[in-house]
Structures are given as structure tokens and as C-alpha cells.
């Protein structure tokens, strides 16, 4: 009897990744109101003080468990809707209007925050360490330039999937053909320290996807890098039959529970010469819409697949196990991070065999489509 490969689904994680996590655009939280964010297995409350500085606390009041995100901002504090206990951004209770004094132990958890290029980040570390400067999120030079648009931003709540599902895409060359309808003509990964890089060139499939809409050959040059466990910066150069666009895509997420996460994505676009600001914003919205459609294609797979710790791979599948080893550094204590997790690793996938097979498949699809169209015309003439 032949041996059967069984799927190992592994164990449920007991901690959330150490690192910077983007909660969204900073301006979202600067409207004078408290905002609820479900993350890291709990609920957070996010608001901005009178200086516009973002503050993040655990949302549940340490007095009687009221939800601070349902309260009000009073001065620089967030006031609980239950008994009006007021909490400052440092986690200390600042006032209890009906009490003679504030109990010395009236403290809640405050979260370290950072603002970069119009986005708000929080630092998560199960050990309680402060963020090392070498793992900070890099600046995006294009942001804030008159030559580039502002962020167009969206988010999707993903249920029934662990964050690692989206990380696996960093090394998944073949899914770009089957899920995103593109020929990957170049594909390379580099992992080092807390950064995982993907170098990708693609050509659109003429039988499916965006390339079929315009009848033009489309190409893409992409450099994507995860800085830590959850935040990817992805400069893109698209060419649609000679019309070129440059953009910077953000692909990021934060965990809600161990089997759900909030996927966020946003784009800034270089304004084409001769295009008005309004037209540039429309272009950015269209590109974001296209990215969203791509993510939804992934989401449909994630919703229906199983977790698999022992994937059976061929050589064109890329360094899945090496990527997961890199990713594991964010789920262990700092003292347990090993050289194998952070040491430099490079791998380029040979795409020749894959593209040869895919070219044949696409040619057959186009030929079949042509026959079906001709048959349809003949039937219409009868």
C-alpha cells in the first residue's frame, strides 16, 4: 500500500507577533472621538490628545469593565461612559469626578505608538520590551511630495485565517499566474534580519484578468519588502501598452484573534504629467480598486483552504520553509531568536519551465475562446 502524505495543521499560536503594526491612517483617529480597534485578542481605544498626538489604551476600563471606546474625550483623557473615570494616554487614571482621590493602582495598559507617512503604528511585544531603533518602519520618500497623491486606503476583515497565510505569498511565485492572472517572468527572495524581500516582474495574461480589458500587453516591476511581521512597502511600475504609472502600495495587517486579522492596503500614485489633481485621485482610486480585487482573489482561497505546516513542495514553489523560519523570529522571545531565523538567505526561482507550460495553456485558452466566439456568430446567423 502506497504511503499517503498527511496534512499537519499544527497548533494554535498562543501569542501575537512582536513588532510594529499599522492600525490605519492617522487622520482617521484625529476627529476628537475615541475609536475602537479589535486587535491582539482584545479591544483597544485610540484617540488624539489636544496636541494631535495619538494615544492607545486597552479599551476596557479597569474600574468596572466599561468600554472606553464608547465614551468621550475630555481634555487629553478618554472618559469611561459607565462612571466617568478618565484615563490619560500614559495609562494613568487622571480623574474620578465623584471621588476624593484616584487610587494609586489605577493604571491600565498603554501602547507605544509611532506615526510615519500619515499612518499610525502600535508596538506589540509579549515580553514588554520597547522597540529597538533598528526595526523601525522606514520613511516613504514619495509621501508628501507634490508629485504624488495622498493615500487611498481600504481594509478587509479576514475570518478563519491566521496572519501567516498572507505572509506565505512572499515566496509564492506560481499563484501570480493562477490567482492574479500574470506571467511571473522574474522572481527572487532575500531574507535578512527583520526584512523579507520579494523581487517580481510580470506580464499580464491575455486570456484572463486586466490585460483582456484593454487588449494591450501589460507589464509590472515590483519590489516588495516586509519590515517586521506585518507591514509591507511595495513600489510598483506598471506599463499598459506604453502608458506607465508609478505607485507605492502598502500591504499590512494586524491580528484580531489567532484565526482572524484585519487586512489593510493603500496606494499613493505619482501624478502623470498633464493630469489634474482630481484626475490623479481618480487614477489612484482605480489602482486601489484593482489591488483590492487582487486581494479578494487571495481571500477566497484563504477562506476555503486549511492550515498546513508541512506543505509538499516542488522546486518552483520557492523557499516556503525558509520564509516561515524567518517569520518565526517574531513569535519567540528575543533571547530565543536564532541565526537561522535572521541570517541572510537568497533564492531565485527559475521561471522558464513554468512559463513554457503557462504559455501553452494560455494559447489553448485563446484558441478555445476564438472557436466559441465563431460558433456563437454562426448560431446567431441561423
Curated annotation (Swiss-Prot):
Induction: By 4-androstene-3,17-dione (AD). [2Fe-2S] cluster binds at residues 61, 63, 80, 83. Its cofactor is [2Fe-2S] cluster; Fe cation. In vitro, catalyzes the introduction of a 9alpha-hydroxyl moiety into the ring B of 3-ketosteroid substrates such as 1,4-androstadiene-3,17-dione (ADD), 4-androstene-3,17-dione (AD), 4-androstene-17beta-ol-3-one (testosterone), 4-pregnene-3,20-dione (progesterone), 23,24-bisnorcholesta-4-ene-22-oate and 23,24-bisnorcholesta-1,4-diene-22-oate. GO terms for molecular function: 2 iron, 2 sulfur cluster binding; 3-ketosteroid 9-alpha-monooxygenase activity; iron ion binding. Its EC number is 1.14.15.30. The keyword 4Fe-4S does not apply. Residues 20-122 form the Rieske domain. The keyword Metal-binding applies. GO terms for biological process: cholesterol metabolic process; lipid catabolic process. It comes from Rhodococcus rhodochrous. The gene is kshA. This is 3-ketosteroid-9-alpha-monooxygenase, oxygenase component. Homotrimer. The two-component system 3-ketosteroid-9-alpha-monooxygenase is composed of an oxygenase component KshA and a reductase component KshB.
